[in-house]
Amino acid sequence: MSAQILDGKAIAAELREQVRKQVEARVERGGRRPGLAVVLVGADPASTVYVGKKRQACEQLGMHSSAHELPAETTQDELLALVDELNGRDEIDGILVQLPLPDHIDEQTVIDRIHPDKDVDGFHPVNMGRLTLRLPGLRPCTPNGVMTMLAHAGIELEGKDAVIIGQSNIVGRPMAMELLNARCTITICHSRTRNLADRVRAADIVVAAVGRPGFVPGDWIKPGAVVIDVGINRLESGKLTGDVDFAAARELAGWITPVPGGVGPMTVATLMANTLAAAEARDSRA
């Protein structure tokens, strides 16, 4: 048995095209192009690549983007002042501060400063709370993108046992809430979890988000399980790989995401969808 591939690249292309058409229709109605401000502090190579991809996506979909590249020595107060300015600018619908930030800046303080209506990453406590309470809001991009992928493939979630490996605020926790809202029974695993292999082997859905290459061996996967690999790890050879042993897991899983080409493209496409949604929501409140 060989798993079916959840082709995030193809599904993301469909989502991006939907967003592009909606932006085009919005402009034809006399509306303003959605605007995304992207803030980068320092010159971390991976962050620089991600920011470039997000800006490129904006341009391809007919959105306005503004880049704010700050030196690594930027103070927290200076960054907060920029966020305040962007919060007040009418042409900006979404604000994205690329993480991680330099050690001298507290990430949560910065996230909290972004207005919830412009928090297109979905990390603000207000938006996290709305997700938890099953209320409409801007949802974290990676978990939201995963849910879009699963829906596109027609994968039934209700009643399934889901294991999420990793408890980060960016992926693990909101992913658990997304799956809980879909009526899965969820287990969140972390560095103190006992009998991790047994828990994973019992799961119908496995989400790996720990940032360690090959952390999940193929023989941990239950036959027919859905495997979502959120990890993006660069080996010394330069090759990108996920948190799951893809070749071995593919022989047992029913569905599996590749790395690259799985979850990553969905994250960027969902960010674009969130930016459009933020613009539409702001218009409805005007």
From Swiss-Prot:
Which Gene Ontology MF annotations are present?
Answer: methenyltetrahydrofolate cyclohydrolase activity; methylenetetrahydrofolate dehydrogenase (NADP+) activity
**InterPro entries according to UniProt:** Aminoacid_DH-like_N_sf, NAD(P)-bd_dom_sf, THF_DH/CycHdrlase, THF_DH/CycHdrlase_cat_dom, THF_DH/CycHdrlase_CS, THF_DH/CycHdrlase_NAD-bd_dom
Q: Which domain of life is it from?
A: Bacteria
One short Pfam family name for this protein? THF_DHG_CYH_C
For biological process, the GO terms are: L-histidine biosynthetic process; methionine biosynthetic process; purine nucleotide biosynthetic process; tetrahydrofolate interconversion
Q: What is this enzyme's catalytic activity, as reactions?
A: (6R)-5,10-methylene-5,6,7,8-tetrahydrofolate + NADP(+) = (6R)-5,10-methenyltetrahydrofolate + NADPH; (6R)-5,10-methenyltetrahydrofolate + H2O = (6R)-10-formyltetrahydrofolate + H(+)
Keyword hit for Hydrolase: yes
Keywords in alphabetical order? Amino-acid biosynthesis, Histidine biosynthesis, Hydrolase, Methionine biosynthesis, Multifunctional enzyme, NADP, One-carbon metabolism, Oxidoreductase, Purine biosynthesis
Q: What is its EC number?
A: 1.5.1.5, 3.5.4.9
To which pathway does this protein belong?
One-carbon metabolism; tetrahydrofolate interconversion
- Function (record text): Catalyzes the oxidation of 5,10-methylenetetrahydrofolate to 5,10-methenyltetrahydrofolate and then the hydrolysis of 5,10-methenyltetrahydrofolate to 10-formyltetrahydrofolate.
NCBIfam families, A to Z: PRK10792.1, PRK14186.1, PRK14188.1
| Assigned protein family | Belongs to the tetrahydrofolate dehydrogenase/cyclohydrolase family.
Q: Give the record's subunit note.
A: Homodimer.
What is this protein's record name? Answer: Bifunctional protein FolD
